[in-house]
Amino acid sequence: VGNPIAVSKDLSRTAYDHLWMHFTRMSDYENAPVPTIVRGEGTYIFDDKGKRYLDGLSGLFVVNAGHGRHELAETAYKQAQELAFFPVWSYAHPKAVELAERLADYAPGDLNKVFFTTGGGEAVETAWKLAKQYFKLKGQPTKYKVISRAVAYHGTPQGALSITGLPALKAPFEPLVPGAHKVPNTNIYRAPLFGDDPEAFGRWAADQIEQEILFEGPETVAAVFLEPVQNAGGCFPPPPGYFQRVREICDQYDVLLVSDEVICAFGRLGTIFACDKFGYVPDMITCAKGMTSGYSPIGACIVSDRIAEPFYEGGNTFLHGYTFGGHPVSAAVGLANLDIFERENLTQHVLDNENAFLTTLQKLHDLPIVGDVRGNGYFYGIELVKDKATKETFTDEETERVLYGFLSKALYENGLYCRADDRGDPVVQLAPPLISDQSTFDEIEGILRTVLTEAWAKL
């Protein structure tokens, strides 16, 4: 038996032996070192050898305020000394109350009720359960189904995974929760119709939701789950008028609109809540990641007064909760993180610089492997193709060889941590910390240009 307090000198080997990494093909590291990050500062991270990398993904769309914010660490320390833990099961504590009020103030319309979770998948799970129980309390028990979009990722809990539109991700865990149905997403680059008319395409895409509601029966559909900008597949922004039409459809058929903003909230697109940027008011917002910039885990489902109302009547109870939901340390860090957002005006910084980021990435269009550059705010995807004219994508063999076998590793070795993703057509995803400026954009573009040029030679 080893000494339990001994510190391993070979973190990489110990990681392979004991740390089961998430969404990771573990055999890749049987004879290769596990990348090990030990420190962060601003827009950069550093590995155990001291090498610096630009964090082009904010960890995992999380570290919005940047790395190394000592005041957030100090906030966590002080809160842990005062009240390290207490649940919000029939009790309150000050930081949960204050953060709930703050989120309600930021949220649009009458979204004033905040149900805390510990992460985004749990927030989505909460929203579906809440929608189901809401309609039961309203005397409409057959309304339990949900509609979401093809290739969309909404989390890994059983319900959230059902809402997810990635068959390969779901197959190992079937049967999943029944009642989750899919419609086309807003990928205009590969639009089956109206590819040259964004407004018409948006109307068509929204109308597919209506068609699915009518096909299933409005009396059976509880909610529609949509990300403001869809992540999986490579950053699909909404076409003009899309969300306004979706809101009309949901109102017409008494269906709840859930804005899944686990990635898009807290400045990623230049507003605290992304629904504000696109001009719609949902019935619920799910959020997490950037709420604390990752300095402590927390998530939330923010609910309109109208939807919360029956749960506040008589003996009714929302029969759901999490031990660590609304954790005092996380709530305190969330408040301090939002203080930074306001003091440094990070949302306006994103709005002021998003066009410069896009323009810099669009320089890559001169590379034969780059088919599309799309996104919003500080959230972009670069779709890779074999043929610009036909938009021909990679074969499975080419994806394995070029995307996994070369691109992911080469970007990292060249000093850029980001994501090469094939949950749809192959894309490189970028979401740097919100403090990023033109120098960051130029560094990203330079590394991408070098590595994508090499990748093209390997096709």
Task: Name these PLM-found stretches.
Residues 2-459:
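Conserved N-terminal phosphate-binding loop of PLP-dependent enzymes in the Aspartate aminotransferase
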